[in-house]
């Protein structure tokens, strides 16, 4: 990798998250915007990435070909769609590039492809890159160990109308953190929908509820409810810049890693708490 600073490539440069990532990359010390990518045929191809993001001229032209920019970046940052991310993953694996993956909605095969690639390249893969959310995940593990065996657990998440997957990747990660603390597999205890006559709540399950409305950036709540009291742990994001800054922080952290699969708790050192 480049000795002076980390050079990053941003996928989906014209999207909401892509523009935030470009702004963050141009502003963060130790980071250089090396490349910005958009899909073939996009009207944004040929634009200056910084100007596209509202951050001023960057000198980096939006392109569609990874091959054309392979010498311009050390770490590839991807918050797009699973099918596109897996294509980028194969390229990065072939060329020894690190990856920061914030894409959600992968099936089991997609997750396995990421695990296999991490044997050769360094990857930070997380559903949410905000510091606050990752602190919350640690709190959920601790709450579950104390209250999870006897309380009813529900996870409620809300996002903007354009989000295409549900429950959110963060909500699923919350469920996995809680289930893991209880020595369970989330697949065996998750309840993703309720409609009509459902009967009484099955003890030991983890329920999920999803809201899609307006321009909500992201809200997540885990509820531990017992008779007479309940505990709610909530995180609310008001700007995507918190995710972008976290992703760039992860890219900087990858500078010293050769291979391996990591998440934001590794980046933040939360596993020691």
UniProtKB/Swiss-Prot annotation:
Keyword Ubl conjugation attached: no
Major site of localization recorded for this protein: cytoplasm
Positions with a binding annotation for NADP(+): 39
One of the GO BP terms on file: diaminopimelate biosynthetic process
Positions with a binding annotation for NAD(+): 12-17, 38, 102-104, 126-129
Entry GO terms, CC: cytosol
Catalyzed reactions: (S)-2,3,4,5-tetrahydrodipicolinate + NAD(+) + H2O = (2S,4S)-4-hydroxy-2,3,4,5-tetrahydrodipicolinate + NADH + H(+); (S)-2,3,4,5-tetrahydrodipicolinate + NADP(+) + H2O = (2S,4S)-4-hydroxy-2,3,4,5-tetrahydrodipicolinate + NADPH + H(+)
Gene3D superfamilies: Dihydrodipicolinate Reductase, domain 2 (3.30.360.10), NAD(P)-binding Rossmann-like Domain (3.40.50.720)
Subcellular location: Cytoplasm
Protein task: Catalyzes the conversion of 4-hydroxy-tetrahydrodipicolinate (HTPA) to tetrahydrodipicolinate.
Family stated for the protein in its record: Belongs to the DapB family.
Protein name according to UniProt: 4-hydroxy-tetrahydrodipicolinate reductase
């Amino acid at each position: 990798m480049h000795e002076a600073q980390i050079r990053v490539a941003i996928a989906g440069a014209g999207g909401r998250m892509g523009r935030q990532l470009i702004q963050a990359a141009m502003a963060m010390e130790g980071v250089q915007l090396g490349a910005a990518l958009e899909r073939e045929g996009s009207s944004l191809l040929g634009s200056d990435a910084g100007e596209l993001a509202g951050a001023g001229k960057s000198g980096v032209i939006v392109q569609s070909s990874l091959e054309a920019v392979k010498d311009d970046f050390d770490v590839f940052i991807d918050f797009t769609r699973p099918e596109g991310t897996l294509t980028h993953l194969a390229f990065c694996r072939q060329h020894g590039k690190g990856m920061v993956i914030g894409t959600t909605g992968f099936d089991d095969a997609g997750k396995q492809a990421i695990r296999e690639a991490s044997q050769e390249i360094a990857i930070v893969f997380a559903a949410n890159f905000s510091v606050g959310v990752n602190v919350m995940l640690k709190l959920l593990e601790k709450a579950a160990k104390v209250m999870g065996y006897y309380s009813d657990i529900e996870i409620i998440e809300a996002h903007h109308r354009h989000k295409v997957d549900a429950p959110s990747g963060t909500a699923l990660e919350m469920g996995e953190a809680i289930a893991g603390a209880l020595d369970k597999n989330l697949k065996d205890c998750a309840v993703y929908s309720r409609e009509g006559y459902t009967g009484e709540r099955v003890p030991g399950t983890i329920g999920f509820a999803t809201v899609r409305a307006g321009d909500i950036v992201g809200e997540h709540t885990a509820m531990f409810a017992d008779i007479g009291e309940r505990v709610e742990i909530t995180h609310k994001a008001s700007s995507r810049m918190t995710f972008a800054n976290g992703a760039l922080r992860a890219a900087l952290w990858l500078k010293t890693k050769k291979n391996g699969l990591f998440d934001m708790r590794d980046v933040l050192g939360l596993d020691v708490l």
